[in-house]
Regions:
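Individual transmembrane alpha-helix segments
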Residues: 69-93
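N-terminal secretory signal peptides
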Residues: 105-203
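N-terminal signal-anchor transmembrane alpha helix
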Residues: 19-43
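N-terminal secretory signal peptides and thylakoid transit peptides that target proteins
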Residues: 196-216
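Short, Lys/Arg-rich, polar N-terminal cytosolic tail immediately upstream
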Residues: 1-13
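Structured, non-membrane catalytic/scaffold regions adjacent to prosthetic-group chemistry
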Residues: 45, 90, 94-95, 99-100, ...
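Extracytosolic (periplasmic/ER-lumenal) interhelical loops and adjacent juxtamembrane/interface segments
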Residues: 45-74
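Alpha-helical transmembrane segments of multipass membrane proteins
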Residues: 27, 31, 35, 92, ...
């Protein structure tokens, strides 16, 4: 007799558990569909993106790089993170479903009530769901507060915080309602059934309805994820200016060939009319600018090269363009900075932030740009407004700019681990943010550490490449064809500007068959020779000379 009772109780418990899990999973899918629609239609950030941005600065650069290596690159790491986050959110919803199912079952047994009205949603479930949704929303708002200014359509930070909080409330509410709805469909009983009846019996019709709705939601989620993937950064993040096309090196890189790096799963798609730029902080005259305000100001054009801190010796994360915009000193003059200002903090629509010294901000070549190569900034390069800071690594040139804040030295944000910046806090650029001098071979085609095609003994070949000295210009480029023992001066065919790269050429006539080690080095505009000591790009940016092997064969 006892065995039968225990067996019945076990089956009843498992049935309650199963109903809760299924209801939670289906509600979790409904929540993800809601998040996807809000992200795609309105640019509202998902909790997944906000959590990533909140946690990222606290990861050590060593852990981040080891994760990249294990994943096989940044894009695979992003995808793994997305899959894990989606599964995690559904799992949490499933746990919520189990708690809800247990809660109702407990009330039934204590108070001896059942689903007498055969209604779709049991009103008594509100006692758990409403507080649960509110508590979850408040907790997420508190934990993610610094990142809530993110808005991928470019809303001002104050409005963005409200929208991000509302997104979580809506999504969590959908999850809570979904748990109640699917639980009711899966566990509904007739009023004639005793509360003591073993197990949880559902009608086939309502069970089918629940699963059909769940299947429709799964199809909708799949469609949303495919759409989001197509517009995501996966196809272009990490695009480098390297490979066979580099043999056609030009001084100005087309916009669609400019190197590209993004922390985002999906880059902002700013709505220009709703976008605003705030300039606040230690100023006497805070300002808010629309794009029309910025576009109406006097502009300058300048040729400037950007180089990523992840640029390795001889790699392609470096490109040159003509930027048009308003000098930052002109904007800052309008807000009247206070005498105690030491640092400028820049924030972007995607939650990115960066700082550098006020003196650098006041240099005439520091630009808030809205055009690139004669056209409006592309979405992937910061439309409608980005920062151009000659001489500093690309991470110091934030895209999708929405706020500029002037700080004094007492501001606590400047005294975080490693400094204040999205990547800076992780440990990048601990030795400084100024770009050291670089040079490389671009043509003939380079494959790894050797030229892709052999050279012909006694036949003159043209070597070409680039040299870049940050904001110091290039005064000389030298080539060695004997592993650095002797050097000859190359011709600088395109001098560029003080803040852009220079292109060089050198004619080499091989005089001996076999393998030769070619090396290039540059001297910057201040007369300083390129650092020859090799240093990996992690975490402080690469240094060292570009060595390439050449195979010389008889004709």
């Amino acid at each position: 007799m006892n065995t039968t009772v225990e067996s019945t109780a076990t089956r009843s418990f498992l049935a309650v558990l199963l109903v809760g899990v299924v209801a939670g999973v289906l509600a979790g899918i409904a929540m993800l569909v809601t998040m996807g629609i809000l992200r795609l239609a309105f640019g509202w950030p998902t909790p997944t993106e906000l959590i990533f941005d909140r946690l990222f600065p606290f990861l050590t650069v060593e852990f981040f790089i080891s994760s990249l290596v294990k994943a096989g690159g940044y894009t695979p790491l992003k995808l793994q993170g997305v899959y894990g986050a989606l599964a995690g959110q559904v799992a949490v919803a499933a746990i919520g479903g189990v708690i809800y199912s247990w809660y109702l079952n407990r009330l039934q047994r204590r108070q001896h009530w059942d689903n007498a009205d055969d209604g779709i949603i049991d009103a008594r479930g509100w006692r758990l769901i409403v507080p649960g949704v509110l508590v979850a929303t408040v907790l997420f708002v508190i934990l993610l507060w610094p990142t809530l200014i993110t808005n991928y359509h470019g809303l001002p930070p104050a409005r963005a915080r409200i929208v991000a909080s509302l997104e979580m409330l809506i999504s969590f509410s959908v999850c809570g309602l979904g748990i109640m709805f699917f639980h009711a469909l899966l566990s509904v009983r007739s009023a004639k059934q005793s509360i003591a009846s073993p197990g949880v019996r559902t009608t086939g019709r309502r069970r089918f309805l629940a699963l059909a709705i769940g299947a429709a939601l799964a199809v909708a989620l799949n469609g949303l994820l495919r759409r989001l993937y197509r517009i995501g950064t996966f196809s272009y993040d990490g695009r480098q200016y390297s490979g066979p096309g580099v043999q056609k090196i030009t001084p100005i890189r087309p916009r669609d060939e400019f190197y590209q790096v993004s922390k985002n799963l999906i880059d902002p798609m700013i709505v220009r009319d709703s976008w605003r730029l705030d300039i606040v902080g230690q100023v006497e005259n805070p300002q808010v600018y629309s794009f029309a305000d910025i576009a109406a100001m006097p502009t300058v054009e300048q040729e400037t090269t950007l180089l990523c801190i992840s640029y390795g010796v001889g790699s392609g994360l470096c490109s040159n363009a003509i930027w048009k915009g308003v000098p930052l000193p002109r904007l800052l003059a309008q807000v009247k900075p206070k005498p105690n200002v030491t640092t400028v903090l820049f924030r972007a629509a995607d939650g990115y932030y960066e700082t550098f010294r006020f003196e650098k901000a006041m240099e005439p070549t520091t630009l808030v740009a809205h055009e690139m190569n004669g056209e409006p900034l592309p979405q992937g390069h910061g439309f409608p407004l980005r920062l151009i800071v000659p001489g500093l690594y690309g991470e110091k040139n934030p895209k999708w700019l929405t706020r500029i804040e002037l700080l004094d030295e007492a501001d606590g944000r400047l005294h975080r681990r490693h400094g204040c910046g999205f990547y800076k806090q992780q440990g990048w650029g601990r030795l400084g943010d100024a770009i050291p001098t670089h040079s490389r071979f671009d043509a003939p085609q380079v494959a790894g550490n050797h030229f892709a095609q052999p050279f012909i003994l006694g036949k003159t070949a043209e070597l070409r490449g680039m040299a870049f000295g940050g904001d110091r210009g290039i005064s000389k480029v030298e080539i060695s064809t004997d592993d650095g023992h002797t050097w000859e001066v190359a011709e600088i065919s395109q001098p560029g500007t003080k803040i852009s790269w220079s292109l060089w050429r050198y004619e080499w006539t091989p005089k001996q068959a076999g393998e030769s080690q070619l090396v290039v080095r540059a001297t910057d505009g201040e007369g300083k020779l390129q650092i020859s000591e090799y240093r990996d790009q992690v975490p402080d940016g690469a240094t060292g000379l570009h060595y390439v092997r050449a195979n010389v064969v008889a004709s």
